[in-house]
Amino acid sequence: MIRDRDTLNALLDSVERFVRERLAEHVVAETDEIPEDIVAGMKELGLFGLTIPEEYGGLGLTMEEEALVIMAMGQTSPAFRSLFGTTVGIGSQGILLDGLDWQKRKYLPKLATGEILASFALTEPEAGSDAASLRTTAARDGDFYVVNGTKRFITNAPHAGIFTLMARTNHEDKGPGGVTAFIVERNTPGISIGSRDKKMGQKGAHTADVIFENCRVPASQVIGGKEGQGFKTAMKVLEKGRIHIAALAVGAAERMLRDALNYSIDRKQFGQPIAEFQLVQAMLADSQAEIYAAKSMVMDAARRRDDGRDVSTEAPCCKLFATEMCGRVADRAVQIFGGAGYVAEYGIERFYRDVRLFRLYEGTSQIQQIVIARNMIKQACR
């Protein structure tokens, strides 16, 4: 749902200009850091508050509006989007969707301005796709919970001011019902951050382990004030995030296809541009068709969610198709570039590595398939 087309177009124009003029992906790839002036520019644009309601200082974008902005951000290194996207997405959505009023008032305004960043602490060394099997524990001790455990591959962990933490509070319930969601502030004694992970791609987007050792978290920090709701909160957060990541994949694919098209027009072999060869045209056409299909899926799912409809099947469909599509487009782009596509100077190999993560985080492609199929079976058996 687009509330005001003129306002949205002005925002999109600003974001596209920011991406085009200031977000140099080769710099962040070489330094593994996002410059402070770029972070300041993101704050000025309101990117840290995209999805946070206006009453808390954010822009309060609808899902459709958010998807369009994220597609624009997908035109450059995903590391830039990761810095604010984790905060406006999985980092804050648990508080926004299920938090108590005072929790929203305390944290959302600071997140909206970028004063603090938020991370989503769900994944563990032994609990990745099987998120319900997490082992991090939170034992009640008076007015506190004592948290022990390790979270792995946590995006923005080195920079986060708060963590949306999922921990097991009911040790008798080994399933999702034993999981509770907490807001844990970074300066809470007992929290330590591991060294930054050395990754295949997305340099500048930092992930690390978060270790909790007898970390005493006030009982008031339980999201929504009720135990046992953490897994439900996590799934709601991830459902929205799947549309977000699908939109990101569409944007990245559009950028790679544009680069491949321009290269194929300029590059000459056998006395003519390689764009005139039908086998190259087939790769270009297949990529365009798949991008169009993925974008249509994302926009449809976003509108459905804005209308208050159930998108528990559509969201994973978007994530599955769009991220797999993006991988195929990346591969074709490298192929069109030929040997140049394998050399760092041209940049397409960097995108090839960067987008590989899209099929892994916030639910692997295989998890999306399982969720889709289960929903289909459940619907058929009603």
Where are these regions (language model features)?
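Short Gly/Pro-enriched turn/cap motifs at secondary-structure boundaries
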Residues: 111, 126-129, 153-156, 172-173, ...
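A short, Trp-centered hydrophobic/proline-enriched beta-strand micro-motif
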Residues: 114-122, 166
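Flexible, glycine-rich active-site loops centered on histidine and acidic residues
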Residues: 92-98
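Flexible, small-/acidic-enriched active-site or ligand-binding loops
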Residues: 133, 187-216
